[in-house]
């Protein structure tokens, strides 16, 4: 059984390589990656619901090395005196900000810098294995290993309005799955039956 309660929520991703897919990559940076990320600011710094959160597209790799359906996932551990519903309400309030109005240009530029840094970290990881992983993924899934040379261009095409439209379409509650993990003390008593 869990020693500490946890919460995860995930949204279905847009089709790979679509403009919305690249917008979701930037939304991941805006909402969850780095100390300036909106969810991190709200859940960790302002509310103190958790000391950290994990998030990303394709939790078993990166946003480029998969083919097929995928999720953008956020997960965190929290204290037992904080209800999962409280955390979801705070998360929804933050996500609604990007769903209802475009992000400003400074936020988009910070997201691009973080994304570029993340991309080059992926490429250089494990003494170049990251580059091989991306080349293989683009060759296998897209028949286009040269796609690695054009990733930044794809992200640079994304506007604040595209980010809002993508958030509105994909980051809605009906497109989400929520997982709540409770400790034994929190779980309702189960009766055994015949």
What would you call each of these model-derived segments?
Residues 3-15, 41-156, 177-182, 189-193:
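M16 family metallopeptidases and their MPP-like homologs
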Residues 9, 19-31:
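Active/ligand-binding-proximal structured segments within catalytic/core domains
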Residues 26, 151, 165-167:
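Short beta-alpha junctions and helix-cap segments that line functional grooves
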Residues 28-32, 41-44, 168:
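Generic alpha-helical structural context detector
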Residues 164-182:
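Bilobed periplasmic-binding protein-like "clamshell/Venus-flytrap" ligand-binding domains
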């Amino acid at each position: 059984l869990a020693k500490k309660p946890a919460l995860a929520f995930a949204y279905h991703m847009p089709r790979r390589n679509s403009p919305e897919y690249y917008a979701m990559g930037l939304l991941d940076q805006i909402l969850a990656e780095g100390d300036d990320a909106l969810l991190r600011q709200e859940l960790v710094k302002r509310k103190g619901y958790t000391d950290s959160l994990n998030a990303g597209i394709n939790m078993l790799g990166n946003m480029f090395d998969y083919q097929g359906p995928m999720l953008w996932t956020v997960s965190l551990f929290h204290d037992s005196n904080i209800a999962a519903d409280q955390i979801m309400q705070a998360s929804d309030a933050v996500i609604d900000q990007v769903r209802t109005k475009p992000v400003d240009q400074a936020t988009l530029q910070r997201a691009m810098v973080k994304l570029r840094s993340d991309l080059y970290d992926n490429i250089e990881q494990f003494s170049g294995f990251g580059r091989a992983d991306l080349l293989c993924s683009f060759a296998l899934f897209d028949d286009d290993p040269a796609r690695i040379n054009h990733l930044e261009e794809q992200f640079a095409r994304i506007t604040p309005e595209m980010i809002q439209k993508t958030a509105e379409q994909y980051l809605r509650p009906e497109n989400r799955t929520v997982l709540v993990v409770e400790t034994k003390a929190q779980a309702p008593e189960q009766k055994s039956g015949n």
